[in-house]
Amino acid sequence: MSEREKITIENIVASTSLAEHLDLSRIALALDGSEYEPEQFPGLIYRLQDPKTAVLIFRSGKVNCTGAKNIEDVKRTIKIIIDKLKAANIEVYDDPDIIVQNIVAVYDLESELNLTDIAMSLGLENVEYEPEQFPGLVYRVEEPRVVLLLFGSGKVVCTGAKEESEIEQAVIKVKKELQKVGLI
């Protein structure tokens, strides 16, 4: 099993722009089940069941999609929103650029970790480890630019990636560094 196959994507956050300006009150009527309370939050919230995602739509035309487990679900979500808005005669772009903002993934090193030893070996300039504050070790990888949270159980959470390949690179990198110093 490759490293990529052992990585589980938990959440992809992506953004796009559907128009220069959107009338959220009108969209709230067009999207059944949407939540729009401008006195509470400036955006409209719309949750989909398939794929199981949520979108935040703003007056500026900006849209954030969250909850996707893969990029195809992000694309499907945006397409569904576009189709529903067009069906309600709301003008939106046909094929907007989608920008991945963050990918959160988990990985299991399949070995218990001594986080104190790891904190010393990875170098204090890239590591935060305060077990009284948080049970995980925060490791800021410089290339690719992601953050890994390492836990004593061997579980690793990766955040800050823009592409799936960055997660795989970071996992391979930390595994090599820990193997080099005999910590896994």
Curated annotation (Swiss-Prot):
Signal peptide: none
Annotated Pfam families: TBP (PF00352)
Transcription keyword on record: yes
Sequence repeat residue intervals: 9-85, 100-178
InterPro entries in the record: TBP, TBP_archaea, TBP_CS, TBP_dom_sf
Molecular functions (GO terms): DNA binding; DNA-binding transcription factor activity
Keywords (A to Z) from UniProt: DNA-binding, Repeat, Transcription, Transcription regulation
GO biological process, one term: DNA-templated transcription initiation
Family membership noted in the UniProt record: Belongs to the TBP family.
Main function: General factor that plays a role in the activation of archaeal genes transcribed by RNA polymerase. Binds specifically to the TATA box promoter element which lies close to the position of transcription initiation.
Listed name of the protein: TATA-box-binding protein
Organism expressing this protein natively: Thermoplasma volcanium (strain ATCC 51530 / DSM 4299 / JCM 9571 / NBRC 15438 / GSS1)
Gene: tbp
